[in-house]
Amino acid sequence: MMSKSNQDIATPMNFIREIEIFFKIKFKYDMAANHDNNRVEYYFTEQDNSLEMDWPLDGWCWLNPPFGKLSQFIPKCKEQKDRGCRIVTIWPLSGDFNQIPTWKESFVSIIHGRIWPEVRGVMLCQWDLDTIKGVRGLRWDKKQLTYCWE
């Protein structure tokens, strides 16, 4: 599902549910949403500005940041993880992985298979104090997530 701007690509709801099933978690907060693309019970809009607040600690946070603000959300995720937040983020795969220091800060899952028509590849980063750091591959076939390599 696309909103009016490519900055606001909505994550397909069935993909969100599969992430919850796969990681055995339940998202409570969407940290970068709008009234048309929110995916969980509580969400924060651009006007709420989640970049300027402490994120909730009482549930898992989902983050699909606007493409134009990726670089602002990376340090925010690290800051909030260090506070104790449990976060799963989705990032577009790009040629420059040096811009995404999450390789050292989170458990990264490379997603094989298209989620949106416009985006060829994405990775999930699970920011959690108890998560083992590393990289694994997952396959998305429009119905479920499965391991394809670890």
Question: For each of these PLM feature ranges, what is it?
Answer:
Residues 1-150:
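Class I S-adenosyl-L-methionine-dependent methyltransferase catalytic core
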